[in-house]
Swiss-Prot record:
It comes from the Eukaryota. It comes from Rattus norvegicus. Mg(2+) 2 binds at D475, I476, D519. Disulfide bonds: none annotated. Residues 470-597, 1072-1211 form the Guanylate cyclase domain. Residues 1-242, 396-763, 1006-1262 are cytoplasmic. The chain crosses the membrane at residues 243-263, 269-289, 300-320, 326-346, 351-371, 375-395, 764-784, 790-810, 837-857, 911-931, 936-956, 985-1005. This is Adenylate cyclase type 5. Residues 858-910 are extracellular.
Amino acid sequence: MSGSKSVSPPGYAAQTAASPAPRGGPEHRAAWGEADSRANGYPHAPGGSTRGSTKRSGGAVTPQQQQRLASRWRGGDDDEDPPLSGDDPLVGGFGFSFRSKSAWQERGGDDGGRGSRRQRRGAAGGGSTRAPPAGGSGSSAAAAAAAGGTEVRPRSVEVGLEERRGKGRAAEELEPGTGTVEDGDGSEDGGSSVASGSGTGTVLSLGACCLALLQIFRSKKFPSDKLERLYQRYFFRLNQSSLTMLMAVLVLVCLVMLAFHAARPPLQVVYLAVLAAAVGVILIMAVLCNRAAFHQDHMGLACYALIAVVLAVQVVGLLLPQPRSASEGIWWTVFFIYTIYTLLPVRMRAAVLSGVLLSALHLAISLHTNAQDQFLLKQLVSNVLIFSCTNIVGVCTHYPAEVSQRQAFQETRECIQARLHSQRENQQQERLLLSVLPRHVAMEMKADINAKQEDMMFHKIYIQKHDNVSILFADIEGFTSLASQCTAQELVMTLNELFARFDKLAAENHCLRIKILGDCYYCVSGLPEARADHAHCCVEMGMDMIEAISSVREVTGVNVNMRVGIHSGRVHCGVLGLRKWQFDVWSNDVTLANHMEAGGKAGRIHITKATLNYLNGDYEVEPGCGGERNAYLKEHSIETFLILRCTQKRKEEKAMIAKMNRQRTNSIGHNPPHWGAERPFYNHLGGNQVSKEMKRMGFEDPKDKNAQESANPEDEVDEFLGRAIDARSIDRLRSEHVRKFLLTFREPDLEKKYSKQVDDRFGAYVACASLVFLFICFVQITIVPHSLFMLSFYLSCFLLLALVVFISVIYACVKLFPTPLQTLSRKIVRSKKNSTLVGVFTITLVFLSAFVNMFMCNSKNLVGCLAEEHNITVNQVNACHVMESAFNYSLGDEQGFCGSPQSNCNFPEYFTYSVLLSLLACSVFLQISCIGKLVLMLAIELIYVLIVEVPGVTLFDNADLLVTANAIDFSNNGTSQCPEHATKVALKVVTPIIISVFVLALYLHAQQVESTARLDFLWKLQATEEKEEMEELQAYNRRLLHNILPKDVAAHFLARERRNDELYYQSCECVAVMFASIANFSEFYVELEANNEGVECLRLLNEIIADFDEIISEDRFRQLEKIKTIGSTYMAASGLNDSTYDKAGKTHIKALADFAMKLMDQMKYINEHSFNNFQMKIGLNIGPVVAGVIGARKPQYDIWGNTVNVASRMDSTGVPDRIQVTTDMYQVLAANTYQLECRGVVKVKGKGEMMTYFLNGGPPLS
């Protein structure tokens, strides 16, 4: 057996000092005295005895000890301890309290509290590992917690609250420079990161840059078709909104085109019909696209239909209107191209093909209709440059937007995947936790963890008192013989087979298994819910156990049997200590039940008179004569009985119950119970279903929580994400979290986090805007007469923009440049304010380059010159007078007319087109808010329209006359005939309208982009928070789990989801085992009304065990593993796994010896300050053991073997206040200069005579 089965009560805890030093002044001794007095049922006077106030053991008190004492006992300097009220809530219910989550996240200093002192003590060293000081970094701690390196060592059983290394919310991590918005380089899955969270970037080679450039033009698609469909569903509502918005602006453009055509007769029916039909088709599509029946499969069809409509409008708009001009239709072609890239939800390839096709159509039709113009080449080259620029800007806008969307989707999916994985593991841990601790205990603990509780002087305990229960102890007789014939695996399998059956029987007989002690099994009926038939349940359980062991006897051929002892009475149940919790029961009645088993007979059920009274004569009994076989029963004059058989009445009742159970089973379609052995954790790790869905993410919980589990975790994530996408409401998310016009978050914290995001593509935005500047320069150099001012201005702007691009791009290539440049680049890119200012500066330069050459053009009014030449009024001048003029005015003539020395700018509309390109450059900067863009674009529009309408109006009036005249001359083929109504809509009228249309469209696009980005940020943030909440719960449950099972054992099962039916067993070559028992605690334990029927005694035992737990938690004892407590016996071992077993240096053996001596010192200190005389006996042994987990429904880790039995005998045959070791242990310790003395030969049960030794001290100090 693993140790003595004597179950004496527990309950008490303390802090471990670096040495057995006093725990403070008289008030601390008063505290111990009060605990001692209450435990023994006597009153306590706070100002009473101060015995030992000047007595010290262990010399002077170190500062670390003083800090520890202060935190252990009192938070202030009061002379009196707070009295323990007689109606302490711990008696009637679980008063066990925990620190709140905030306490174990950050233990700040509180006036007079223990939090700061405990932190200082932990920092000083020499104590157990504690929470880091407030304000310290928790990253390493979090990593340690995640790796399972920290076990729960709660203060007041605070369940790891002091050791929590909880990760902060993702929202708290969204600081400047963390690179939360990653860049994509065009990979198939949405782009890889070019993040710069650490301030370092990636050095890109020329080849990599070229590949990245080529990747831009590739359509993005996830490798998995299912994932791609999910992505399309993810953005379906947003794409639907974009499509609707595009249709609206297209209708607006068509109406503007109709208005322009109607303003210049004669009207062309075909033109009007096509545009009207286009408007009608677009409106019908808009209605259809917003119907409920419209879904993702229809999106592509609608997009391509819209492209077809745009192409039709493009062809008709260029072929039919008069007067003809190669510059006609440029503005709407640019508009169509750009909106296809930005508002039409199509792939990059389709957008590029559409843009190129629209550009080619315009160029081809212009070439066809204006072939006779001598200046056509200039216009075509300029048009090519404008369309090329528009396509490039469209690509520069479409690419990062799609990459950002795909990345947001991927990151959200990864958050959900991690959350579901954490949730599955968390559910496994919770099932495992609830399999070890009864639900009411575990739930009470978890409730107290989240509740704020004030620090108390002593550790709190969970103790519940239950009257009228029956306790069953059962021991396998002949287990030693069985174990000697089995291998390690066979032994674990056999025990698991047997105890699995016992667990099933316990469930069927309404018994709660308490613990397995080696080959001893004990359970209680009447817990946690009271039952009137608790005695019947225990008797039936005993009969079934005896029947079950018979099958083992038949299969193995070993003479094994069961001794069963039952007693009915009162118990205290709960957990004790700080580590390796095991639910247990304590009371004098439990002790009596244990002795009933020891004094029983093999194959028989041994009951007391109290149990017999509860059986109501349903069983035939005979005298048990237990006193003849057990001294305890004889000493206490316990009348015992042996069950013979149940009466006929009881047989009929059992048959009726069995029949009802069968009917209930058949009615619900269950299969008959399977009697094969279950595997540990099989019942607790098998489920992968999702128990709750994400909340606060804009969608409701799924209704069907019993959906079939997905065999593939990836499929489960996709299914979950699909349900989330279907359930989320974009409109509701937007209305709840985002303001309508400003598009700012309603919550200031959210807005602050969003504003701190870093856009690593800022350098690309500046580069794209600079590229627009170059195109504008080339357009104007081609179409506008050259001047020195033009060249000097463009060169200056180019140098400035090159510098801005250089500084901005350094951010992604920081390793190549000096530190000052890196710092400057980082300050610009990582600050939204600075990057916005730089962006505005860049756009301003581009805008200036678009119109500044207007001031170098001839400003003479051609209308005035013609009126003077023809001797007519200004209002009478028309295009015919241009044709009739003697000066041969023409569009191709750049010589200044009317005697002006300045050159003619006969195509001022290209200034407007250049301004449109500058507006497109504004839209490239995705990090600028839509309101900021609107203000900037309105400023550009206002300035340019004022220039057009005031100083530059003559340029546009002159151009109108020349274009009309050129068209008339072409249509007349050289004749002098002049039409009556040869006119066109004036450019000074057209210009404000088309710029306003562009500003509106670009604002709507900016609003759509920012709205999408904010919703993506919100959804990802909420998904991340959900994931981190689950990870925190998972980490917490893992610490709870590690407080029940060794870390390597828990990891073994939790990491093998698909192999959870394997048994866990391990043969350990050389393990040191310790049993430490308080020999006279049973004498101390009394059940009186004054001490709450023994609860105060258990409180004292809890303090002692907690002190031992804190000692074993110290770093120097990291090789040790607490196995369990058995009443007042503390069991530990070292060298149970590869990380703690030191084959060469035997350090794990020395560590256990040091631990044993530390416990002795601690017990002396406790006696001094609690005014008690507890005597501790400790036994040590080394040798091979078998470690494993047994029990399917309530898995329990334990060790077995001869080594364990002998260590237990070293304890039971030991001498009070001495540490007894075996010869094997002696040889190792003596070789390391430990101080030992020979005790002599001792008779050991089952082993005969053994030579033993006493451990007196460690190696002498050098």
